[in-house]
């Protein structure tokens, strides 16, 4: 296993939006920063799950596409020369006798004076379509993740699911695809009422209460057989692509074994964002405290708190309260 013997000031576990802003802010405090991310790209769930969706609750943006927000955060972080390690899952974190943290991933050993974990809800995997033939089409036209809506231009698309993601994808695909069908096992959708109303008023073909029972095709899915729940109706739908939105299963995985105080699958932190382990901080959806609200906007506020207190932990003479950013960049 490779070993990076350089001891960084701050190592961030998780390269989602909060992790990216944490890395930028670490640069603001002149800290050497490393990000370790398990996915092949930065951006976390924004990039992996809904890059094309709009976000409406980030201060200063009436609306912003998820991937655009990630790109902006990456550009912001690029003001500093931060080290990024992709496709590395952190398996263990140990605070050594000398106070330095040793982080072991599936590929490499890292060392750091402090650690800030911004891993969202932990590792996440999509709930799969439980049909015998589903797996064979995953590299063809059965999708759990969507990178680019334009790949469905002029196509017949079936969306499976009844939550916010399923309804949102169906509505976004309507003006692009040739035909969109949404298939849900209940008559009532779990999505926000406004989205469901928009769905009912759209040209999307709503099929409820139906479940898929068979995928027909050789190398690609050509048709879906659906059957009515507690009924006798059966239909066959011609498709070019199938999008599965049954939600995701998230897990803290090995994080539970790192000696951190865990409460309801979240890491307990103090007002300084420090965990029960001195020098180990958390920010974003991964952490909890009294009154915690799990929003990207909240995580953006927690990141500077974690970094500034990590800086003071490393150097007790350092100010927790930083200079204003305008005074730091106006001459650069």
UniProtKB/Swiss-Prot annotation:
Belongs to the ferredoxin--NADP reductase type 2 family. It comes from Bacillus licheniformis (strain ATCC 14580 / DSM 13 / JCM 2505 / CCUG 7422 / NBRC 12200 / NCIMB 9375 / NCTC 10341 / NRRL NRS-1264 / Gibson 46). Its EC number is 1.18.1.2. It is an enzyme of class 1 (oxidoreductase). InterPro entries: FAD/NAD-bd_sf (IPR036188), FAD/NAD-binding_dom (IPR023753), Fd--NADP_Rdtase_type_2 (IPR022890), Ferredoxin-NADP_redctase_2 (IPR050097). Homodimer. It catalyses: 2 reduced [2Fe-2S]-[ferredoxin] + NADP(+) + H(+) = 2 oxidized [2Fe-2S]-[ferredoxin] + NADPH. Keywords: FAD, Flavoprotein, NADP, Oxidoreductase. This is Ferredoxin--NADP reductase 2. Binds 1 FAD per subunit. FAD binds at residues 37, 45, 50, 90, 124, 285, 326. It holds the Pfam family Pyr_redox_2.
């Amino acid at each position: 296993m490779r070993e990076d013997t350089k001891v960084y000031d701050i190592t961030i576990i998780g390269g989602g939006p909060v992790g990216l802003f944490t890395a930028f802010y670490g640069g603001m405090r002149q800290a050497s920063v490393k990000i370790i991310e398990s996915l092949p790209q930065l951006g976390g769930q924004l990039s992996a799950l809904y890059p094309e969706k709009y976000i409406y609750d980030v201060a200063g943006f009436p609306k912003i596409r998820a991937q655009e927000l990630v790109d902006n955060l990456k550009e912001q972080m690029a003001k500093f020369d931060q080290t990024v390690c992709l496709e590395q899952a952190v398996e263990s974190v140990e605070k050594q006798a000398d106070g330095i943290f040793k982080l072991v991933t599936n590929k490499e050993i890292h060392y750091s004076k402090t650690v800030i974990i911004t891993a969202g809800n932990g590792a996440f995997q999509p709930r799969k379509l439980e049909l015998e033939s589903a797996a064979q089409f995953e590299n063809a036209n059965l999708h759990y993740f969507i990178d680019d809506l334009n790949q469905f231009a002029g196509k017949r698309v079936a969306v499976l699911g009844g939550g916010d993601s399923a309804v949102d994808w169906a509505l976004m695909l309507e003006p692009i695809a040739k035909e969109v069908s949404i298939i849900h096992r209940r008559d009532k959708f779990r999505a926000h009422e406004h989205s469901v109303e928009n769905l009912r008023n759209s040209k999307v073909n709503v099929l409820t209460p139906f479940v898929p029972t068979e995928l027909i095709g050789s190398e690609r899915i050509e048709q879906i057989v659906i059957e009515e729940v507690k009924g006798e109706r059966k239909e066959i739908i011609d498709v070019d692509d199938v999008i599965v939105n049954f939600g995701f299963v998230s897990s803290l995985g090995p994080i539970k074994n790192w000696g951190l105080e865990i409460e309801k699958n979240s890491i307990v932190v103090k007002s300084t964002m420090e965990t029960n382990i001195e020098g180990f901080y958390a920010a974003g959806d991964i952490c909890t405290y009294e009154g915690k609200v799990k929003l990207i906007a909240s995580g953006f506020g927690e990141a500077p708190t974690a970094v500034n207190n990590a800086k003071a932990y490393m150097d007790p003479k350092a100010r927790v309260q930083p200079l204003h950013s305008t005074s730091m960049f106006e001459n650069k």
